[in-house]
């Protein structure tokens, strides 16, 4: 019996167009013959904003909702005021589709340089809460523009929101060989939110006796990410701290050029979205210089989320092999890297 994979594709801005094309190339090559790939491209980002003033409408959300998953290239352009696309598209989509798990694997792959001394063992996953914290837009200003201006940005943390992301993190830790989960917060200063996170973490931990747990203040976690990244297996943290430490994690494991991410709706009520961590890089857009590796690894995350474990592993193996050989190869274009990876996964 044939199957189908119905994918919404959002190339977005800058190099997003180029890297998404290579991600789709690899996806088409790796899928079993009985799986029909159906894609629909959506024009979101700076071009549409300038043409229509729109970022993401309710009709757009309805159209996206019909798909199994979403593949995003990059959103952002210097011609658009800061915050317009970030809040009007990225955050709006995240909240509308309840992407409350932001998944960021960090693994130092063969042939990839790290700024850390030696070649440390780096293989961990950050599970970042995606729909609460200070990103909810709960805040404001008074006396704006005066020397007495006051600005607030409220961090919203609910027991429901915290528990569901903590449970997701425990399940992921349980499925990994090391079975270790670290909670990162700042509960000695942010006592209200911090204690909510800590209490729920400890409550859920009792249901996972095989998972080793520990706690780190976020400032201590940043130190250990640099001095001893091997101590981490799975990290769970809130939206703001997760936003910060995931980029540090990417930096120590080779940079954002190889960093993939998933914005996950674990229940499957809405399609999850997968994207490279890097930005739109308008300075090199259209020149064939962008490395599509992070997008290809995001495709692997997408496939694993949808249950295509073998295909995801083949992509990851192909990327590892390709990265390990790059030192002996001349520079390649975006499409040449995609061609190589597609050929590897096709066998």
Curated annotation (Swiss-Prot):
Keyword tRNA processing: no
Residue positions binding NAD(+): 279-291
Cofactor binding annotation: Binds 1 Mg(2+) or Mn(2+) ion per subunit.
Keywords recorded for this protein, A-Z: Amino-acid biosynthesis, Branched-chain amino acid biosynthesis, Cytoplasm, Leucine biosynthesis, Magnesium, Manganese, Metal-binding, NAD, Oxidoreductase
Any GO BP annotation: L-leucine biosynthetic process
Positions bound to Mg(2+): 219, 243, 247
Binding residues annotated for substrate, in chain numbering: 94, 104, 128, 219
Alphabetical list of Pfam families matching this protein: Iso_dh
Molecular-function annotations in GO: 3-isopropylmalate dehydrogenase activity; magnesium ion binding; NAD binding
Catalytic activity: (2R,3S)-3-isopropylmalate + NAD(+) = 4-methyl-2-oxopentanoate + CO2 + NADH
Pathway annotation: Amino-acid biosynthesis; L-leucine biosynthesis; L-leucine from 3-methyl-2-oxobutanoate: step 3/4
Family to which this protein belongs: Belongs to the isocitrate and isopropylmalate dehydrogenases family. LeuB type 2 subfamily.
Oligomer and partners: Homodimer.
Reported function: Catalyzes the oxidation of 3-carboxy-2-hydroxy-4-methylpentanoate (3-isopropylmalate) to 3-carboxy-4-methyl-2-oxopentanoate. The product decarboxylates to 4-methyl-2 oxopentanoate.
Record protein name field: 3-isopropylmalate dehydrogenase
Gene label: leuB
């Amino acid at each position: 019996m044939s199957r189908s994979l119905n994918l919404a594709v959002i190339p977005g801005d800058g190099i997003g167009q180029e890297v998404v094309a290579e991600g789709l190339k690899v996806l088409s090559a790796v899928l079993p013959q009985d799986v029909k790939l159906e894609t629909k491209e959506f024009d979101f980002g700076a071009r549409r904003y300038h043409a229509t003033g729109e970022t993401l409408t309710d009709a757009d959300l309805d159209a996206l909702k019909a798909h199994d998953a979403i593949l995003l290239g990059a959103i952002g352009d210097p011609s658009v005021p800061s915050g317009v696309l970030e809040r009007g598209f990225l955050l709006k989509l995240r909240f509308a589709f309840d992407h409350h798990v932001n998944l960021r694997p960090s693994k130092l792959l063969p042939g990839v340089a790290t700024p850390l001394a030696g070649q440390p063992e780096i293989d961990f996953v950050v599970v970042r809460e995606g729909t609460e914290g200070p990103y909810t837009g709960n805040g404001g200003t008074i006396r704006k523009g005066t020397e007495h201006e006051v600005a607030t940005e409220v961090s919203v943390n609910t027991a429901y929101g915290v528990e569901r992301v903590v449970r997701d993190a425990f399940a992921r830790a349980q499925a990994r060989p090391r079975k270790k989960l670290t909670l990162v917060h700042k509960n000695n200063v942010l006592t209200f939110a911090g204690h909510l996170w800590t209490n729920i973490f400890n409550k859920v931990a009792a249901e996972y006796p095989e998972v080793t747990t520990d706690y780190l203040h976020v400032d201590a976690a940043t130190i250990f990410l640099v001095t001893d990244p091997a101590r981490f297996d799975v990290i769970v943290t809130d939206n703001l701290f997760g936003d910060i430490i995931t980029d540090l994690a990417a930096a120590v494991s080779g940079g954002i050029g190889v960093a993939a991410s998933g914005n996950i709706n674990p229940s499957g009520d809405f399609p999850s979205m997968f994207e490279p961590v890097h930005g739109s890089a308008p300075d090199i857009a259209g020149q064939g210089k962008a490395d599509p590796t992070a997008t290809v690894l995001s495709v692997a995350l997408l496939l694993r989320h949808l249950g295509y474990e073998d295909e995801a592993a083949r992509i990851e193996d192909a990327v590892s092999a390709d990265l390990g050989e790059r030192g002996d190869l001349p520079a390649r274009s975006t499409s040449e890297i995609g061609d190589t990876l597609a050929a590897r996964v096709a066998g």
